[in-house]
Amino acid sequence: MNSYISLIFTLLFFTSAARSSSVSVETGSCVRYTTIYSSGSSEFTSTITPETPSSSSSTFVPISTHTSSATNTTSGQLSISSSSSTSSEYSSSSIPITTVSSSDSFIPSSSQTISASSSTTDNVIVSSSISSTVSSTPVSTIYSGTSGTTFVSSSTTYQVIPTQICDGVRGLEYAVYNYDLPSESTFCHPSNGYTEVSTFNKPAYFGSKDLKQSAPLFTGIFSSLDDIPTYSASDYLPAYPPNPEGMSSTSSSCKTIVYQFFFRVPATDNWSLFVKNVDDAFFGWFGDKAISGWSNVNYDAYAHWRIGAYGMGTFDLGYLEQDSFVPVRFVLANGAYIGGFDFAFNSSSTGPVRTTSYSYTSTCDKSFLPFGKGNGGLDEGTANV
């Protein structure tokens, strides 16, 4: 698009150029995790949701001296540590929680037993990643913490037992390609100075077997701790990880960005996707077809730039259950001059949510295909835009 003319018109008005729709979404789900901390006849139970850190631990202050042991029966990471403390003694009615000052983490071999012992004023901390199964076993190996613990046999054993070992992998993936469709001359190099948006009508090409590029220009994954940078009216690509300097110094003209991720629903409610700053054209797919079978004609969302207005739109995802997964795919293409695209998921109970906090590259039983040729796209027909 012509950046100067667009700026003038955008200051005058900001209107929508979008296809709003109600989308039928196929979803999947993963289990929550219940971890039990026990000592003798008492136990404390907590629930770990996927949005909490992927490991859990609890601190126990023993009466007199004792030995704690645990066995890791899967490939998960096991941690046992000891820290000096003046906390009150452990009683059957409560489990004091204190700060861990030192710890040691390792991956034991199959059926290896690790034990930890402490004096009266020390804490013994037993923790495990949620992909582990940890249970009490006879003591076989002495672990000494940094506080100078001593080994004394005892009948008291503390267990950390994460139930279930199924969860997805956090992250939001993207790939950047050169726009090399036959419509390049009109989409990227318009004779009248304005991108002819309607000539981009084959978005699935960028994930099909027909893709001519052997590899994307850039590719990366947003972690759950990353924010997606604002991308609006820019002459350059957005500063995405892991190479923000390289992307932000590369022209956004004649480029296509493909996004793929599973959106884990934060709360049971009616959900929608809101897009804005679209420059020049955006296509979206939801449900299993976003993984494989996304085509030029079965898209669920579309928005585009036009003279005087960036594309924007709201797309209804329907009523979704908490912790269900929605496969999502976006294709954004920019022709001439500046580009842009921002998006957010929204519900009445949560408002707009931070997308990366609820994004996964795979779930318990589903994953996306690698970027490049055969990324699940079917370059058949043309979009009616």
Swiss-Prot record:
Return the Gene3D superfamilies for the record.
Answer: 2.60.120.1560
Enumerate the UniProt keywords alphabetically: Glycoprotein, Secreted, Signal
Taxonomically, the superkingdom here is: Eukaryota
The main location is: secreted
Residues making up the signal peptide according to the UniProt record: 1-20
All copies of the PA14 domain together span 196-360
Q: Where is it found, in Gene Ontology cellular component terms?
A: external side of cell wall; extracellular region
Output the PROSITE patterns linked to this UniProt entry. PA14
Q: Does the keyword Signal apply?
A: yes
**Entry's localization field:** Secreted; Cell surface
A Pfam family annotated for this chain is: GLEYA
**Which InterPro entries does the protein's record reference?**
GLEYA_adhesin_domain (IPR018871), PA14/GLEYA (IPR037524), S_pombe_Mam3/Map4 (IPR051905)
Q: Which residues are glycosylated?
A: N72, N270, N346
**Disordered: annotated segments:** 41-90
One GO term of the biological process aspect: flocculation
Q: Which PANTHER family match?
A: M CELL-TYPE AGGLUTINATION PROTEIN MAM3-RELATED (PTHR31492:SF14)
The record describes the protein's role as:
May be involved in agglutination during conjugation or other aspects of colony formation. Induces flocculation when overexpressed.
What's this protein's name? Putative cell agglutination protein pfl8
Q: Which organism is it from?
A: Schizosaccharomyces pombe (strain 972 / ATCC 24843) (Fission yeast)
The organism's taxonomic lineage, starting at the top: Eukaryota, Fungi, Dikarya, Ascomycota, Taphrinomycotina
